[in-house]
């Protein structure tokens, strides 16, 4: 079944036209995505949840954003983010629990499974504080091979130094750190 996306302008606003997802990624047409990073306090540190992508996705076997997805035509950033959390990780959340880190653009040109890929995303990035154990997530097997909590600062270091297989962009991870560090939940309560 085809998935249709809103074509957006440079400000992430729908133009009133739609495009098939595969065409958007083949031709480099701008569309929207939502990214949600789950974070939690563990002892003295803030941890971030990474998902491991399946072998059948682009960037197979790489660690990635906790939950992310393309926004279907007619849907907004928040509903899409909440839907993807539920589908990929089995996590239910309310819109008011998501903390917006900001918007960013992603331009990515590559070849996956022998096909050219020209991705142009206008992305809204969110943080969700969620203290769950890895075993308590209900993973979507077509999308996610597993999940792993990692100290946020260690994750930033490992991404900078490319010390593990990942498709995480450092500027986005720094956005997450900035927002998470300002939250009262980031500070250990006395």
Locate the predicted segments by residue.
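A short coil-to-beta-strand element that immediately follows conserved catalytic motifs
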Residues: 92-103
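Acidic, metal-coordinating catalytic segment for phosphate/diphosphate chemistry
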Residues: 1-44
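Nudix hydrolase/Nudix homology domain
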Residues: 22, 61-63, 67, 73, ...
């Amino acid at each position: 079944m085809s998935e249709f996306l809103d074509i957006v302008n440079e400000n992430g606003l729908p133009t009133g036209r739609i495009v098939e997802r595969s065409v958007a990624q083949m031709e480099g047409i701008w569309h929207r995505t939502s990214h949600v990073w789950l974070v939690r306090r563990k002892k003295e540190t803030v941890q971030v949840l990474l998902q491991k992508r399946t072998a059948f996705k682009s960037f197979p076997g790489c660690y990635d954003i906790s939950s992310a997805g393309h926004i279907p035509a007619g849907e907004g950033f928040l509903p899409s983010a909440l839907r993807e959390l539920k589908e990929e990780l089995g996590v239910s959340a309310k819109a008011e629990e998501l903390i917006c880190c900001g918007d960013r653009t992603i331009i990515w040109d590559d070849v996956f499974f022998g096909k050219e890929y020209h991705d142009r995303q206008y992305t809204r990035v969110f943080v969700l504080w969620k203290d769950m154990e890895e075993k308590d997530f209900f993973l979507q097997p077509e999308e996610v091979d597993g999940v792993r909590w990692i100290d946020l600062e260690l994750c930033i270091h490992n991404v900078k130094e490319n010390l593990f297989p990942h498709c995480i962009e450092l500027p986005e991870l720094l956005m997450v750190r900035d927002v998470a560090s300002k939250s009262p939940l980031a500070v250990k309560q006395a």
